[in-house]
From Swiss-Prot:
This is Cysteine--tRNA ligase. A motif ('KMSKS' region) lies at residues 266-270. It catalyses: tRNA(Cys) + L-cysteine + ATP = L-cysteinyl-tRNA(Cys) + AMP + diphosphate. GO terms for biological process: cysteinyl-tRNA aminoacylation. PANTHER family: CYSTEINE--TRNA LIGASE, CYTOPLASMIC (PTHR10890:SF3), CYSTEINYL-TRNA SYNTHETASE (PTHR10890).
Amino acid sequence: MSIQIFNTLTREKEPFKPLKDGEVKMYVCGPTVYNYIHIGNARPIIVFDTVRRYFTYRGYDVKFVSNFTDVDDKLIRAANELKLTVPEVADRFIGAYFDDVDQLNVAKASVNPRVTENMDEIIQLISTLIEKGYAYESAGDVYFRTKKFKDYGKLSGQELSELQHGARVEYNERKQDELDFTLWKAAKPDEIFWESPFGNGRPGWHIECSALAKKYLGDTIDIHAGGQDLVFPHHEDEIAQSEAATGKTFANYWMHNAFLNIDGEKMSKSLGNFITLHDVLKDNDPNVIRFFMLSVHYRKPITLNDAILEDAKNGLERLMIAYQNIDHRIQTDDGEYVEEAHEDEWLEQLTELKQAFEDDMDDDFNTANAITTFHELAKRANIYLAKETVSINVLREFLSMMRLFAEVLGLKLENTQTDSLDDSEVEALIEERLQARNERNFARADEIRDILKEKNIILEDTAQGTRFRRG
């Protein structure tokens, strides 16, 4: 079947139809770089990286844009607290961002535009909105006329009348209407600013993404994505600005991931459960964090705690062990492999598992089901490895398919931890242990096993001999 996407705009699953055959234009809202990103921010980063990977696997050329908001009130406050300039704060935490997400095996975006490097495009978009009557200047600020855009609220499912009735009104004499939102903020004393036709100042948050998406992807894009907290007002305002300026549909598909909770509670500074990704990665394998994030469908809330992370670690380890055992069996081929009688049946099973994996991912990128299929693949690999005679063709197909699934999900099946022993040294110790056991020197054999265990190397005694893996 074709790829099906749950579209927040229509509240339905829809078959994906790109603007241009073989190409996907995708924009994902990036972080405001005033601090390390929190662990909840990592969910959309991992989820939409996986969406991108699957499109690539399906043969699409994906143009993937994710921005950095490198000037706003939070950055200005952070600069004052750290006694740095706003650009220095942004540079520090953009660097930290890449350090962290690189560990999560997140592919580089086609472009990561900074707001401050695209100010001309932002100012031009605001000017267009003023010219078309959708925006107005007021004492150095510029505001968007929300009620003039008749489709306002279509993404979040809210009516303008409901917004008016439920608005938390903070009186602002510069606004013509309480629902109008800021496109440009007049400069305050001692704050960073840019020159513009409206006066010195800096952009509001929402206009940035509209301008950047337009510059790097065009007036209409295939997919716009982010966390569900961005549906309103951020993405709603983006639609209003972009479609008012161009007269065209801004994005055909809107994708939003659900929240990450800490022990069942939404993460917040007030609850004292606010955790940065940077801190989580100090104590946890990034491969496990990625596996954990993909173990639940992206539109369902996900809970983080020690027990769930341990489950994720064990689940990932089962896949890694199966992969490493197959690889070891192939690498130690002694020429005794035979043409196994049921080779075609096993290859057919693998074809069916590949189709099941694709069906899972085609169904709104259901990584939870895809991981279940991955575990079924590992289970069958273990069954096959236990056979007395095996086919090298089947083994290689198992290995190839595990690599394929892992690549789509962005998981690493090879052990990435380092130790002080290389493979030849490990093999030498295994040989010494075997000799000790043959000589009934069990104390020395156990000592060697303990030495290897301290080096994070686990031995497995099988009918084919002793194997090792790095745990």
